Amino acid sequence: MPTLGVNIDHVATIRQARRTVEPDPVAAAVLAELAGADGITVHLREDRRHIQDRDVEVLRKTVRTHLNLEMAATAEMVEIALRIQPDYVTLVPEKREEVTTEGGLDVIGQQTHMADVVQTLQAANIPVSLFIDADAAQIEAAAQVQAKFIELHTGTYAEAKGEAQQTQELDVLKQGCDRAAALGLRVNAGHGLTYWNTYPVACLPGMEELNIGHTIISRSVLVGLERAVREMKDVIAGRG
């Protein structure tokens, strides 16, 4: 059964809507862990639209499970990661105009740069995951740059219309898991997962961790964060 990494970006989104001090994502991380979260994920974007540098610094000191820092592969972010020392880093694509991450990294198109970033971080004992589509060529490129993990982009699966298309996209993810395993890559997944579509992804062979945020934070507005996290844990375990 995969573990659950709770992404708390959207707690910060609510805070930044008013440029105030609440709700505090650090407090949300504590509640998520108490409810059974196996890890905490945050995306420190270049435009700082939600998570702020202060959040990452305090989370590094307070998270008791593990801290996954999502970031672009830029010199600024590498410097921050080396200073903060998260438990691992997930490199993600980033465009200022996007509402949320729109797809996986093009590792093939920037293989030399990715290899340099991966080497720099892993030399500092920070394992690196690459957020990529379940494309065989991209998975092979991830192995070539010596990443420890990949995180499969589940957005296309999540947006599939109808059972047939969803089944087709799930098979693409399964093939990605199989290819990654053959190359010695560990596999996480995330993006667009909800209480209604997560379980099939949790059942994929070799799946280690699911990073889920928006649906949990949305649910927490209605039932509270601890219950929302527990309910997602139940979904992953097949009890939901």
From Swiss-Prot:
Keywords: Cytoplasm, Pyridoxine biosynthesis, Transferase. Gene3D superfamilies: Aldolase class I. One of its GO terms (molecular function) is pyridoxine 5'-phosphate synthase activity. It holds the Pfam family PdxJ. It catalyses: 3-amino-2-oxopropyl phosphate + 1-deoxy-D-xylulose 5-phosphate = pyridoxine 5'-phosphate + phosphate + 2 H2O + H(+). The keyword Transferase applies. Catalyzes the complicated ring closure reaction between the two acyclic compounds 1-deoxy-D-xylulose-5-phosphate (DXP) and 3-amino-2-oxopropyl phosphate (1-amino-acetone-3-phosphate or AAP) to form pyridoxine 5'-phosphate (PNP) and inorganic phosphate. Belongs to the PNP synthase family. Homooctamer; tetramer of dimers. This is Pyridoxine 5'-phosphate synthase. It comes from Acaryochloris marina (strain MBIC 11017). The lineage of its organism: Bacteria, Bacillati, Cyanobacteriota, Cyanophyceae, Acaryochloridales. The gene is pdxJ.
